Amino acid sequence: MVDFAKSLFGFGNYKKESSSQSPTPPPSAHSSQEQHHKSNTEEYPQSHLSQQQHSHRYQPPHMSEQSHQFPQQQQQQQQSGTNKFFPKTLVSAAPTTAVANHSSVYGTTSTTTNNYPEAYLNQTFKNNIYNPQQQQQQQAQQPPPEQQQSSAPYQNSANIQQPYGNQWGSSQDQDANIITIDKTGNKLSPASRDSPIKGKLKVTILEAKDIFATQPYVVCSFESSEFVTNAPDSYGKSPVSSFGHNNNQGHNGPRNMYNSNHGPSPKALPMKNSGNLFGQRPSMYQRQLSTPHLNLPNDSSNPIWNHDTIFDVVGSKSELDISVYDGARDDAFLGHVRISPSTDKNNKNESEWLQLGARITGETVSSGHIKIKWEYTSFDNNIKRSYGPDDFHFLRLLGKGTFGQVFQVRKKDTNRVYAMKILSKKVIVKKKEIAHTIGERNILVRTSAASSPFIVGLKFSFQTPSDLFLVTDFMSGGELFFHLQKEGRFNEDRSKFYTAELILALEHLHDNDIVYRDLKPENILLDANGHIALCDFGLSKADLNMDGTTNTFCGTTEYLAPEVLLDEQGYTKMVDFWSLGVLIFEMTCGWSPFHAENTQQMYKNIAFGKVRFPKDVLSPEGRSFVKGLLNRNPKHRLGATDDARELKAHPFFADIDWDLLRAKNIPPPFKPHIVSETDISNFDTEFTSENTSALKRQMEMATTPLSPGIQANFKGFTYVDDSTMDDHFARSYRANAFRPPGSFIPGDPNLPPDEEVLAEQIEEEDEMEVDEDQHMDDEFVNGRFDL
């Protein structure tokens, strides 16, 4: 026991035997682990609330006035001026995510240094286990008299810098042998081989009527992609509406479009349990609705936008969600409508008026209508379906990490805004992270195909001889960490809302045999409506069933479960629930429950320390929930019996309607302020303020291309056969060794097992040279430290 304690807390040289060259935690003495498998709790006054010191993210100067002192700890001025939930030992550390605020592929979090990669995904997609009911809009109202419309359509900004231009060629002309599977896991015939994109949906927001708003704007969501209109081009007149009510009716409050007795038109969004009276709604939503969301102005407005957008279509029965907000009144929600455009074949819907309604029974909304039109165009064999860097305009840098950078980009053919993660192959091979990098892409493909509503979707993956590219939906609300840092902490209802949506995301991953392993605020994104999306699967592991274990020592220090540090037999998916307990404690209390001045003490706190709850912050049900998640014995931890379903049944969530939550019909407690689809105000200015022209010059100064043998490590990342990559590499190398050559179409989930990749990696790694300034010291990456 003495030797073990010395080795754990830095007083000895004990190391766990492993084939990995990376630092791994020592095994535990079972007797000591049994004695400390539960978290003891203490309370102290709320005056001791504090915000932890976090290092890698910029914090505005005014934030220092909002933070509280940690008990028995003097406030210290950091060189970066940052306050984070990370220990001070990480002040000079590189960011653990490549994204200051982004999508699931945004992060570039990596695993333990020199750790041998985990197994690849050895299977294709599973059947979709999440099949929400598609709620088809059935309205057939007569349009009102035509109003004045602006002739100026929405135009893209003309002064956007474009770092890359056309210096990277395309490989679209190559006829590769492609293996493709559909959403259900069935292999497609050669005739139907293509990228995941099956067509495009053009949506035009024309105008609205009887909207009680001063600065209305519209958020359109389709398959996790978002479009935010600018301010209206003009406003029409406000005569008595042809819908049978005048504008003065709003003075007494808008009518609830979901009352069954209201009006002749059907509901735009059928609601489960919509027959419940407001008095029968769960208490959480009674509290939310007790404060009016909408203070109506005296006169209604008829905004005219004529703004259109094009969505890349992946699914066949996806919903288009249209929500209207008022930017002049703290983004007040005015109403929304959902329709399901037919995407089975070419289809066109002329303009129609849709009635705006509430998201939940009893919610106050405007009594207006919105006029839209849409057109779906299916791709045929003559349409280009191979993509590369030259198919995107690069707008802004969003984040940097160990392996690369994340950009906000605009797809040239559709003007759709995405997030693009660019990973350096040289750095990946040097750090022996090939398997985890490709594994991240595989998990994104699998989760995107299963249409999980709370996981960022992967739209494209391709590669050049020097880099890997992952293109995902852009989440304009930024990282949850950005908002947590700004506000210090959240109230219990807001924390509960985010936790509940995270439980649904983890439930989806665990049911698909995926353990996440890196849950933290930096890896949780907010969309334009305020819902969460889980991102960054660089540390995730697939093919881990309920009883399966894994041994890789990875994650972020403050969120590591004790069994990762102590159990030589490995750990299970229960590590995600431990991290969830740490996260909800941070959100509600404002600091990490296991914070310490140094890493060794933090490990000790995780293994044996007490959790101290501040007074009057968490309800008894909330404390019980956190204690259940922070049980040090994973076999007794909340969720050990029935995974996420056990968490959902906890009394803490007694007021949650999980069906409504899964359908995103519960109003989020917070709506990010968004002014346009390219708005980056919710992202860290440390990254977004960088000059993209300078980044362009850095990217153009390509390093020496990799050999064909090393390139073989990345086979399977795209939909090309083994020879295409080498042939393309050879041609591009002869043409210009310092010009990043062409790119390829999105990737194939059928990848080689890690044994093949590892063999290639070991043979070729000695041929590589990587500039030392491309990566930080290993000990400062992702909180990985020697025990």
Curated annotation (Swiss-Prot):
Pfam families according to UniProt: C2, Pkinase, Pkinase_C
The EC number(s) this enzyme carries: 2.7.11.1
Ranges for domain AGC-kinase C-terminal: 654-729
Signal peptide interval: none
GO biological process: cellular response to oxidative stress; cellular response to starvation; chlamydospore formation; development of symbiont in host; filamentous growth; filamentous growth of a population of unicellular organisms; filamentous growth of a population of unicellular organisms in response to chemical stimulus; filamentous growth of a population of unicellular organisms in response to starvation
C2 domain ranges (all copies): 182-354
Disruption phenotype: Leads to reduced cell size and to sensitivity to rapamycin, caffeine and sodium dodecyl sulfate. Attenuates the virulence of in a mouse model of systemic candidiasis.
Bias kind Low complexity: ranges: 132-155
Residue ranges constituting the Protein kinase domain according to the UniProt record: 392-653
Any GO molecular function: protein serine kinase activity
Biased composition annotated in UniProt, kind: Polar residues: 156-172, 239-263
Gene Ontology annotations for the cellular component aspect, listed alphabetically: chromatin; fungal-type vacuole membrane; nucleus
Presence of keyword Ribosomal protein: no
Gene3D superfamilies found in the cross-reference section: C2 domain, Phosphorylase Kinase, domain 1, Transferase(Phosphotransferase) domain 1
Function: Protein kinase that is part of growth control pathway which is at least partially redundant with the cAMP pathway. Plays a role in filamentous growth and virulence. Prevents hypha formation specifically under hypoxia at high CO(2) levels. Required for chlamydospore formation, distinctive morphological feature of the fungal pathogen C.albicans that can be induced to form in oxygen-limited environments and has been reported in clinical specimens.
Protein name, entry field: Serine/threonine-protein kinase SCH9
Native organism: Candida albicans (strain SC5314 / ATCC MYA-2876)
Gene it is expressed from: SCH9
